[in-house]
Amino acid sequence: MIRTKKQGLLIVLSGSSGSGKNTVCDLAKKTNKNLWESISMTSRKPREGEEDGKNYYFVTEKKFEENLEKGNLLEYAKFAGNYYGTPKSSVQKMLDSGKDVLLVIEIQGALQIKERFPSALFIFLLPPSMKELKRRLKLRHTESEEELMKRFSIAYKEINELPKYNYVIVNDEIDEAANKLNAIITAEKCRVDRIEEVYLDSEEEKMHETLVDKELENKRVNL
């Protein structure tokens, strides 16, 4: 009998600010009940409508650095002047339970994950165009003009990191992008190197061994 490995799949989703990572992730989780999103820790201030423990764990820069020193983070990055990181314990617990864990993180953190977990699945989310990316960021009204220019500059640099990812999804339509994310996860879990072969039960194994022994004995007699 063939079965998938019990441990869940570690999935990394990256993309520039305004690419729609969080929205796509939320939609994907609605139809994929085995997908669990890790909540990141950040030192940035909450935006309007964001909740602590739901969107992020919002902490001070000092508190973040304390967690970093204690080894409590799976990865971390400093982006646009703020720290972002993934708490370690909850991720491992969910993977061991068989849940597929999705990390929505910046490229710096993703590359750290790739070094430590090369078998993880890496997906990059792109906006349909840089023009559309600028439009989306401006609609948020959360950054100053200077901050927007900084994010545009970072986005251009991030595109050069695409070859380090396994898949790219162009987020032209939210529902379609979420469906593609789940389709990639499903296909990836069907790869030969992600499954294991096991015997149906011990009695079947013994029966097989007995038949092999008899066949070898018959060959020796015929010789």
Specify the residue positions occupied by each region the protein language model found.
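ATP-dependent small-molecule kinase phosphotransfer cores
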Residues: S40-V101, Q108-L111
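Walker A/P-loop
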Residues: N22
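Post-Walker A helix-loop "phosphate-sensing" segment adjacent to the P-loop in P-loop NTPases
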Residues: K29-S38
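NTP-dependent small-molecule kinase module
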Residues: T4, K157-L223
